[in-house]
Structure formats: C-alpha cells, structure tokens
C-alpha cells in the first residue's frame, strides 16, 4: 500500500495529518501508523499515511573488480628480457596494486552512496509533495507531518530542505537515522523552523541516549521550537501503548482540548 486516506468525521476539518512510516513499514503498519491514522478522524482531523519507496542506498552494491594493468609489449625487433624476478618484488607489486584498487573502490562506493542518498531524497520529497497537495485539496487549514522510525528522519529532512509553508508542525516518533545518508537527525533537528515534538521511549536505552543528544543540540539554537515527550514501552499491553502515544501526540498538537 502506497497511501491510505481517512477523511475527518467533521464538516469543517481543521487539520490534516500526514503520517510517514519507517523503512520496512507500510501505510497501515500496526505500530503507531495505523492506530494514529484511524483515531485522528474521530476528532475532526483528516489522516493520510504515505509509505516510503524502497531506498536505493539500501540496495546491494555491485563489486567493481580492478582490472590489472597490461604488461608493456617489447618494441619491434626486440625480445623481452628474461631474468628471474625476486619473490619479494612480486609481493611489493601485489601489495601496491591491491592498495590502489582498494582506494579506487572506496572512492567509487562513496560517490555511489552520495548519489543514491540524493536520489532517495528526491523520490521521497516528491511523494511528500504529492501528499501535501492532496491534503490541501480537502480544505485542511493546517497540515501536520508525523514520522515513525526512519520516516521521522525523512519528514524532518523534507521540512529542513524544502520548508513547505503548508506544513505547520512536525511529530517524530521513535526517530531513527537510516544508514548511509548525508545528514543525521542530530544535525537536522536544530535546523527545523516549525514546532517539533520528539517522542521517544524512555525505557529503551539507545533511544533515550539519542534523544538526549538531540535535546542538547536543540538547546544550542536560539528560539528553538523543539520539545521532547517521553513514552513508556508496554510490551504486554500494546493497545495501552498505542493509546498512550495517541494521547501524547494529540495533547501536544491541541493542548487546549
């Protein structure tokens, strides 16, 4: 599923929520994505969940074998000299050739990674542009972008690089930076110009540590609109965990309700 739309149960909808699932997830993913997209319309908000395309950066990279240099041919009328080559000389040549090949392969891989990252960003941004345009067609007065997992990264990068005026808020849930991307969340978060809620599970050590770093980075920025909200993982009560998440997100988006 690429996208799922659920209109608001209201004749005058105020908000459209665009939900961006993470890598390996889809538009009705049971963790965070589907519960949120189904609950928001009950409170008068449109919901649109949009799956990410498969990333080129995650595809297996073809190994490029270095082609050995051809030996120079003797000039006409000359015969190649015949003499024994010391074993250590052969070893030195082999080592030098291998080192050159590794440097070339490393450079090629780095260039390919940068190109894939940019291509991935363009494809994802185009999909989010289409989602924003679709929400606007349904008369939403305000648009909120919600990202889950690596979807939070791409939502943040989209707002940082494109700064669409139609999107007024960002919610990041259990945010993760994908592998092999140009910018990480730590560098993106301070650049955001819209109010941002960063929801993380305080009971998960890795998530808590990453969230702490993002919080410190945001504090170094003047007039930051960044706010963190902690969640408690409930492995034995997933329904309760999802309800907790919805209440925290809704409470931040509409504190007066």
Q: Where are the regions that the model predicts?
A:
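Alpha/beta-hydrolase active-site loop
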Residues: 59-138
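Conserved alpha/beta-hydrolase
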Residues: 37-62, 66-67
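Short beta-strand element of the alpha/beta-hydrolase
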Residues: 13-22
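Gly/Ala-rich beta-loop-alpha elbow adjacent to hydrolase catalytic centers
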Residues: 145-156
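The feature captures the conserved acid-bearing segment of alpha/beta-hydrolase catalytic domains
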Residues: 164, 169-236
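The serine-hydrolase catalytic nucleophile loop
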Residues: 27-35
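C-terminal catalytic histidine-bearing segment of alpha/beta-hydrolase fold enzymes
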Residues: 224-257
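A short loop-to-beta-strand scaffold at the N-terminal edge of the catalytic core in hydrolase folds
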Residues: 1-8
């Amino acid at each position: 599923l690429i996208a799922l739309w659920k209109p608001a149960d209201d004749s005058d909808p105020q908000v459209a929520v665009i939900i961006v699932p993470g890598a390996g997830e889809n538009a009705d993913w049971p963790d965070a994505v589907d519960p949120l997209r189904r609950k928001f319309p009950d409170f008068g908000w449109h919901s649109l969940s949009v799956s990410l395309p498969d990333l080129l950066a995650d595809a297996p990279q073809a190994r490029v074998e270095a082609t050995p240099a051809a030996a120079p041919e003797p000039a006409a009328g000359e015969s190649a000299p015949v003499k024994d080559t010391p074993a250590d000389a052969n070893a030195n040549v082999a080592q030098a050739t291998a080192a050159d090949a590794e440097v070339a392969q490393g450079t090629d891989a780095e260039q390919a990674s940068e190109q894939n990252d940019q291509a991935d960003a363009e494809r994802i941004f185009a999909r989010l542009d289409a989602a924003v345009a679709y929400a606007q067609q349904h008369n939403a007065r305000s648009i909120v972008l919600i990202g889950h997992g690596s979807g939070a990264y791409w939502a943040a990068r989209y707002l940082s690089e494109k700064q669409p005026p139609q999107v007024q808020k960002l919610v990041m849930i259990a945010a993760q930076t994908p592998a092999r991307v140009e910018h990480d969340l730590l560098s993106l978060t301070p650049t955001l110009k819209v109010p941002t809620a960063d929801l993380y599970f305080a009971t998960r050590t890795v998530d808590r540590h990453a969230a702490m770093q993002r919080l410190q980075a945001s504090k170094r920025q003047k007039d930051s609109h960044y706010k963190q909200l902690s969640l408690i993982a409930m492995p034995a009560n997933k329904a309760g965990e999802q309800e907790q998440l919805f209440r925290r997100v809704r409470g931040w988006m509409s504190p007066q309700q």
